[in-house]
A protein has these predicted regions:
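N-terminal [4Fe-4S]-dependent radical SAM core
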Residues: 1-32, 76-77
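Accessory C-terminal segments flanking Radical SAM cores
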Residues: 2-4, 244-296
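N-terminal charged/capping segments associated with class I S-adenosyl-L-methionine
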Residues: 9-13, 17, 22, 47-52, ...
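Canonical Radical SAM [4Fe-4S] cluster-binding loop centered on the CxxxCxxC motif
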Residues: 23-62
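Radical SAM/AdoMet-radical enzyme domain recognition
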Residues: 64-83, 92-218
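Active-site neighborhood of divalent metal-dependent phosphoester/pyrophosphate hydrolases
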Residues: 86-87
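Flexible glycine/acidic-rich beta-alpha junction loops that bind and position SAM and/or redox cofactors
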Residues: 155, 190, 209-230, 248-260, ...
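Iron-sulfur-associated redox domains of electron-transfer enzymes in respiratory
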Residues: 182-187, 198-202, 216-241, 258, ...
């Protein structure tokens, strides 16, 4: 049983990402490219609220322009981070590869982060294509797989089928092929009661390089659930300091973990409509509205 630690406002201080002396270059950003608003899953808590909306897919011309805009804002002497996102970015893999190639042709000091639900990695051919990618081989491409463990029942296919067995196969495939990857885990109502134990099990079983957490705050009960976040956080930190946990749980250890070289000042988002959202990296995330309401 996890001991109860009371914190009335965990959403304001749950993470410690801003409690570090790492440099924060002016104008630097977590630069997110939404290649498409379409996805091969239909997660029940998805913030994008896309059913019935027409496709929004970036063209190569738009991709080039947005990357030029990002480079114009950022210091040319610092590394630029570009997040390859959706929807499901792997559904637009040709454009994803184009974005990496175009960005690299303009600036060598760049890193790409592919954020994906992982379903495409059921295919050995797609695994082979990824590990043979120039940027993956140069360690310029990191891969984040979304998986919610015991709460994964909310991550369903469009027909309503639970994706958990498919995701276990995906993670097994990645481990078998020695793919470098990280897991993104959303803490929500269906895993909050056991998210510490669940996370430790996932880390030990599937061996990600990092375990990156986010919180679906709207699904939690402040009176009952917020203390569970804080209690588990303290257990993770205890394990980290004791040396029992070697995989960083982001962003719970940023004050003591040297895994990242710098912090980013901004989060900036691009869809096919342009730079739709920009806000401070450690501000509370505003309600998602980047794909505007449309009539087909």
């Amino acid at each position: 049983m996890i001991p109860i630690v009371v914190n009335p406002h965990p959403n304001k201080e749950f993470y410690v990402g801003d409690k570090t002396d790492k440099p924060t270059p002016s104008g630097s950003g977590v630069n997110v490219l939404y290649f498409t608003n379409k996805c091969n899953l239909a997660c029940t808590y998805c913030y994008e609220d896309l059913p019935g909306r027409p496709p929004q897919i970036m063209t190569k011309e738009e991709i080039s322009k947005f990357i030029d805009d990002i480079f114009a804002r950022e210091n040319p002497n610092n590394q630029t981070l570009i997040v390859l996102f959706g929807g499901e970015a792997t559904l637009e893999w040709e454009n994803v590869c184009y974005a990496m190639e175009y960005a690299y042709s303009k600036k060598l000091n760049v890193h790409f982060n592919l954020t994906t639900n992982g379903i495409k990695y059921l295919s050995q051919n797609f695994i082979d294509e990824t590990v043979n990618n120039f940027f993956y081989k140069k360690r310029m491409l990191s891969i984040d797989i979304s998986f919610d463990g015991i709460g994964n029942g909310d991550r369903v296919f469009h027909g309503g089928k639970d994706s958990t067995s498919a995701m276990i196969q995906v993670l097994t495939n990645l481990v078998k092929n020695n793919v470098r990857y990280r897991i993104r885990y959303t803490i929500q109502k269906n895993n909050i009661d056991n998210w510490y134990q669940d996370s430790i099990h996932i880390i030990k079983t599937f061996k990600p390089l990092r375990f990156i957490t986010s919180v679906a705050w709207d699904t939690l009960d402040p009176a009952e659930d917020f203390s569970k976040l804080e209690s588990a956080k303290e257990l993770f930190r205890k394990d980290w300091f004791a040396g029992d946990l070697k995989v960083p749980v982001c962003e719970l250890f940023c004050d003591v973990c040297n895994g990242c070289g710098e912090r980013k000042e901004l989060k900036t988002y691009f869809t096919n409509e342009g730079n739709v959202t920009t806000y401070g990296n450690y501000e509370n995330t505003p309600k998602f509205h980047d794909f505007k309401e449309k009539i087909q």
